[in-house]
A protein has these predicted regions:
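Structural signature of hydrophobic alpha-helical transmembrane segments
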Residues: 3-17, 54-72, 123-138, 184-196
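C-terminal ends of transmembrane helices
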Residues: 18-32, 71-90, 141-156, 200-213, ...
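Cytoplasmic-side transmembrane-helix entry/capping segments in multi-pass membrane proteins
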Residues: 34-43, 63-66, 85-97, 156-168, ...
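Transmembrane alpha-helix boundary signature
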Residues: 51-64, 76-87, 103-119, 143, ...
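Transmembrane helix-loop junctions at the membrane interface of multipass transporters and ion channels
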Residues: 107-118, 182-188, 215, 222-242
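Mobile "lid/hinge" segments at catalytic clefts and subdomain interfaces of large enzymes
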Residues: 209, 224-267
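Membrane-interfacial segments at transmembrane helix termini in multi-pass membrane proteins
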Residues: 246-310
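Structured cytosolic domains appended to multi-pass membrane proteins
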Residues: 291-469
Length: 469
């Protein structure tokens, strides 16, 4: 039995890794996402049970206390947290994953200097990487959470000489790392590395605007995976290495996909302070130019008539729908329209909202049928034949300036081509700009009608008016 145990544990890890891969594959489609999530959860349970059978485990009581506390907190969070708060939840979970990895590295360092065992170069490097990636993920995710929750301003937060200061701090980390490699039991230097890692995480996310939060959340998710993988090397656990590598790789791929959807490089997201206030006189900036433009507005009754007597309607959800928690009202409106013979579709932009798949998650929670959800590339050719495009709280992702104005900061960004529809109704609180800080040309087109108010209240009014048609 004793001889079989190590082999059995490794085989369990192999099965768990296979379940993770299958789960990731099924998470790629809304129709199979729930099943994929369940497969990944079973894989994680198997990995945890196998690890608990390891003979190196010294204190089961502490482990089970931790599991109990964590499970209770997780269950309460899953029950209490609204779907509209999922970006904040994901940010916190990323941060906790980074914290766990950093604590593993810190614990291993403490063990090595406490037992007097010789510290190898490989030990030191893996511990440094675990502390760096884990620390950056922890504080970076908490800053992202604070921005999403409104505890910190969503706009980029910058200060003079910010990039040189960041560079100096990073150089300081590398210098201290080199010194720790030469003196691997130096506690003062090690604690300094921990502190620098935490500071770097804060400085990394502060200058990033709210419009880039989907990319940041995805990148931090990747970091949490890399941190777990580094922790796996620290404690020589193959399952941690594999699982962390899967999360890290998938997160990086998703980050690149989202950057492509915004027509921006990752470096411009991290260092460009996108979404800050526009300079006066720059193309696309708000100012006197936008004040000279005119727009048309409608009330809920007129908008309901346009929707109710249309043959085809495409709904474009955005962050405004998430903030107003209007997804259930939107589903009810779609049901009413379909009952009158209107064909209803949903157009999803990859970076709409505040996390990857934000709109998909909200619409799934409202039980919107998966076949009605269309990606940007699939729906854009259909706008020419669409009678009414209903924009709910989306801004930059439907701005035609991205296609027509070479001077605009969002020029080249793939958008949902709502301006090609026969008519457009835009539900919005006011005429303010999106996170890119540029005016939206769509709002001033002859075919566009502005319907002002909170998304949830306005959609509820539309439902009531459509019922009366």
């Amino acid at each position: 039995m004793t001889d079989f145990l190590p082999t059995g544990i490794e085989l369990s890890y192999l099965v768990a890794a296979s379940l993770f891969i299958l789960g990731l594959k099924q998470l790629g489609s809304p129709a199979t996402a729930r099943q994929g999530n369940s497969l990944a959860a079973v894989g994680m349970l198997l990995a945890v049970v196998a690890t608990l059978l390891d003979q190196q485990v010294l204190n089961y009581q502490m482990i089970f206390v931790g599991l109990l506390i964590g499970s209770i907190i997780g269950a309460i969070a899953a029950y209490k947290v609204e779907m509209t708060d999922m970006p904040q939840m994901v940010g916190l979970l990323n941060g906790l994953g980074g914290a766990a990895s950093a604590l593993v590295a810190i614990g291993e360092f403490w063990r090595l200097i406490g037992t007097g065992e010789p510290v190898t170069l490989a030990d030191t490097i893996t511990i440094i990487l675990g502390v760096l990636i884990g620390g950056v993920t922890l504080t970076g995710s908490f800053v992202a959470f604070a921005k999403l929750q409104g505890l910190l301003p969503g706009a980029p937060m910058t200060f003079p000489l910010q990039q040189p200061v960041n560079a100096l701090i990073l150089i300081g980390f590398f210098v201290a790392s080199g010194y720790l490699i030469l003196t691997p039991t130096n506690l003062t230097v090690f604690l300094g590395l921990v502190a620098i890692s935490l500071v770097l995480g804060v400085l990394f996310v502060l200058p990033i605007g709210g419009g880039d939060m989907p990319v940041v959340i995805s990148l931090l998710n990747s970091y949490s995976g890399l941190a777990a993988s580094a922790a796996g090397f620290v404690v020589m656990n193959n399952m941690l290495i594999i699982a962390g590598a899967l999360v890290g790789a998938s997160g990086i791929i998703l980050t690149q996909i989202m950057c492509k959807a915004m027509n921006r490089s990752l470096t411009s997201v991290l260092f460009g302070a996108f979404g800050g206030s526009s300079k006066p006189g720059t193309a696309g900036a708000t100012g006197s130019g936008s004040q000279d433009k005119t727009y048309k507005s409608v009330d809920a009754e007129e908008a309901a008539m346009m929707l109710g007597y249309a043959r085809s309607v495409v709904i474009i959800p955005g962050y405004g729908m998430a903030v107003a928690q209007a997804q259930h009202s939107v589903r009810e409106l779609a049901d009413q329209l379909e009952g009158k013979g209107v064909e209803v579709k949903y157009a999803i932009h990859p970076v709409a909202g505040r996390m990857p798949g934000h709109m998909n998650v909200l619409l799934a929670e409202a039980n919107v049928p998966y076949p009605q959800l269309y990606d940007m590339d699939d729906i854009n050719p259909q706008f020419d034949e669409t009678d009414v495009a209903l924009v709910i709280g989306a801004n930059d992702v439907v701005n035609p300036a991205a296609r027509t104005d070479a001077a605009s900061p969002i020029y080249g960004m793939p958008i949902l081509e709502v301006d090609r529809a026969k008519h457009a109704i835009v539900i919005k609180r006011g005429m303010s700009t999106g996170f890119a800080g540029v005016d939206n040309d769509l709002f001033y087109k002859d075919k566009t009608m502005m319907l002002f108010g909170s998304a949830k209240e306005i959609v509820a009014q539309l439902v009531s008016q459509v019922k009366q048609l």
